[in-house]
């Protein structure tokens, strides 16, 4: 996955950036008829069945009349028996009282405990959800109220907790609750360049962070994103277009680009943004 400085010459990141719409050529001109798709070819109850009976002489066809109503009653009875059996524990989307679970690794147990007040306050007060930390299973459990079916706030709270577990600060992760156009992207160093092994992986991670974290800070401030480097995984939080620019910068550093070259591209992009403003 090769990138160059031209990747930073795209349009400036916009807070409300969205993917481009499809061209008319990509959209099919006609759709199949619903009548054809839902055409019922099953035999009706008042129809006859033609049954071939093997005979030694000739291939005569006998008409046999079956009691279809009896077959329907048997099928209904089987369905009723299945419905009385054990129900699946998997809940469908929109069920009242639906819950989500976010597992907590060992190294994030203490930070979660220290920031627990700052985490459950926006979830309970702003979103009106129920949240608890299961000490036995070491996971955060978030649940919708019994009288609510909408899962939008439930998903926002789940993304907020997950972002904190990945290593983002509470003040940065809470933007997932307040803003609707933010996304969270995760990839590994090996996804960019498979041939990196041993010390080369450490050097690539060092180029991303920079001395005293300056390189990462420059990318964050220029692209208006937040980046977390956790071992060989890179997590980026930001708007759609901003994620693209930050990802290109990080990938360029992983592939061996000189940090000064990346700095120059970011400075040019920042200067163009200042001129437009």
From Swiss-Prot:
Residue ranges, compositional bias (Acidic residues): 8-27, 72-81
Keyword flag Transferase: no
Molecular functions per Gene Ontology: RNA binding
CDD domains linked: KH-I_PNO1_rpt1, KH-I_PNO1_rpt2
Gene3D superfamilies to which the protein is assigned, alphabetical: K Homology domain, type 1
Localization terms from the record: Nucleus, Nucleolus
Quaternary context: Part of the small subunit (SSU) processome, composed of more than 70 proteins and the RNA chaperone small nucleolar RNA (snoRNA) U3.
Known role: Part of the small subunit (SSU) processome, first precursor of the small eukaryotic ribosomal subunit. During the assembly of the SSU processome in the nucleolus, many ribosome biogenesis factors, an RNA chaperone and ribosomal proteins associate with the nascent pre-rRNA and work in concert to generate RNA folding, modifications, rearrangements and cleavage as well as targeted degradation of pre-ribosomal RNA by the RNA exosome. Positively regulates dimethylation of two adjacent adenosines in the loop of a conserved hairpin near the 3'-end of 18S rRNA.
PANTHER family: RIBONUCLEASE Y (PTHR12826), RNA-BINDING PROTEIN PNO1 (PTHR12826:SF13)
Name under which the protein is recorded: RNA-binding protein pno-1
Organism: Caenorhabditis elegans
Gene giving rise to this polypeptide: pno-1
């Amino acid at each position: 996955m090769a990138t160059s400085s031209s990747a930073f010459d795209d349009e400036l990141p916009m807070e409300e950036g969205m993917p481009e719409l499809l061209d008319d050529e990509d959209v099919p001109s006609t759709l199949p008829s619903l009548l054809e798709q839902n055409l019922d070819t099953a035999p009706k109850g008042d129809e006859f069945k033609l049954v071939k009976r093997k005979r030694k002489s000739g291939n005569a066809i006998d008409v046999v009349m079956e009691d279809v109503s009896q077959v329907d009653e048997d099928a209904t009875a089987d369905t009723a028996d299945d419905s009385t059996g054990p129900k699946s524990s998997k809940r469908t989307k929109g069920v009242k009282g639906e819950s989500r679970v976010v597992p907590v690794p060992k190294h994030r147990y203490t930070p979660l405990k220290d920031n627990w007040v700052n985490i459950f306050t926006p979830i309970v007060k702003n979103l009106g959800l129920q949240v608890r930390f299961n000490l036995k299973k070491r996971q955060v459990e978030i649940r919708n109220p019994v009288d609510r079916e909408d899962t939008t706030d439930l998903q926002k709270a789940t993304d907020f907790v997950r972002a904190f577990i990945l290593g983002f600060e509470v003040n940065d992760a809470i933007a997932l609750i307040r803003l609707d156009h933010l996304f969270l992207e995760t990839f590994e160093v090996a996804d960019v360049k498979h041939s990196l092994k041993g010390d080369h992986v450490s050097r690539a991670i060092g180029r991303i962070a920079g001395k005293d974290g300056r390189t990462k800070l420059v990318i964050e401030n220029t692209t208006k994103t937040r980046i977390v480097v956790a071992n060989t995984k890179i997590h980026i939080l930001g708007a759609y277009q901003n994620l693209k620019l930050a990802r290109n910068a990080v990938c360029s550093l992983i592939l061996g680009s000189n940090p000064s070259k990346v700095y120059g591209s970011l400075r040019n992009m920042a200067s163009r943004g200042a001129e437009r403003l």
